[in-house]
Amino acid sequence: MSDLSARLDALNPEQRRRLSAGLRTQRAEQVRAPVALPEHLRRSLYFFASADHADAGSYYAFVLEAAAEADAAGQHAVWFPERHFVDFGGFSPNPALLAAAVATRTRTIRIHAGSVAAPLHHPARIAEEWAVVDNLSGGRVGLSFGSGWHPDDFALARDDYRERREVTGRTIEDVRALWRGETLPYPSTAGTTTEASTRPRPVQEELPVWLTATGTPQTFVTAARAGYGVATALLGQTMPALRENIARYRQEWQDAGHSGKGDVVVMTHAYVSDRPDLEDFLRPAMHAYLRSFRKQTGGSDEFVLLENAYLDFLTGPSLLGSPAKARAVLADLAAAGADEVGCLIDFGLPAADVLESLPTLFDLGVAAVERSA
């Protein structure tokens, strides 16, 4: 154990509280100016829980209830990830399964994958599975595709990890073609070729597609040139970097000659409440969530680093905080160019508390608010 770890472990609760306060004072107060929150900014729910904080059955019941509430409140979409072999996101190894369950419990909300790890699957299976969900939902499916990043995931892959980005591009185009009803040749047994056309036929003629971007500028460029939307997050990129990436995406979209302006979805953590103990209430769940995230990336889980990261979330551009703070962040994201904000709600808080908070999240208005300068 390092000397820093030993010193942190020796802190009593009051000393840890004072440490947190000291870290917080190092963050400059935001300068604010009035701005109107655009009505076009869509809001959705993102699900990306760590599988070490609840039992699976209870978690799935929570997802279905939250999705039903979002549907009733007129929210735009729910998004489900694909993760393998780790706790982080581990409740969703196949987003089509959760999507199918939600499709039968909702009426209007869109149901999206955020994302499908394209290199791990045959394009025909992706098209088939999601066409089922499209039929169950009456045409509410959309897919964001990712290239995968963890080498362990590629135990499931047909192709080499080093070729994952090229494979992703080919897979997306194959899925889109199959979705439209085209027939594609695929290798079969004994050196033969199968002419594949998928069933069932989906409700939507065209599949809405996004490319998942962690913040790497080239991914925004690739998506724009191909005519895809972008699904990104504030985890791993700053607000200035996000603004630059979105501006780059819009310019590349225009230069490629596409109609419209593309589509950008930004995910951020969300729990909106005026409760006076909010910081202390959120801390254990956020520490555990960040620890799970750092575990998969090989990062440190020392208290001071977790606390620093937590306070960055609390005081930065997340929807963790009061309604006034959340409205300000939504305005900032709209000003940065976001078309949709995905609210990640399942980061370890008790399900009852999250569900109780959803009306406040859904009721964030479009009146004049404050925006960080």
Predicted features along the sequence, with ranges:
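Glycine-rich, proline-tolerant flexible connector loops at the mouths of alpha/beta enzymes
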Residues: 77-98, 117, 235-237, 344-355
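N-terminal beta1-alpha1-beta2 module of alpha/beta enzyme domains
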Residues: 28-105, 110, 207
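Flexible, low-complexity inter-domain linkers and amphipathic docking helices that mediate domain-domain
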Residues: 1-38, 373
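Conserved, mostly hydrophobic/aromatic
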Residues: 74, 82, 102, 133, ...
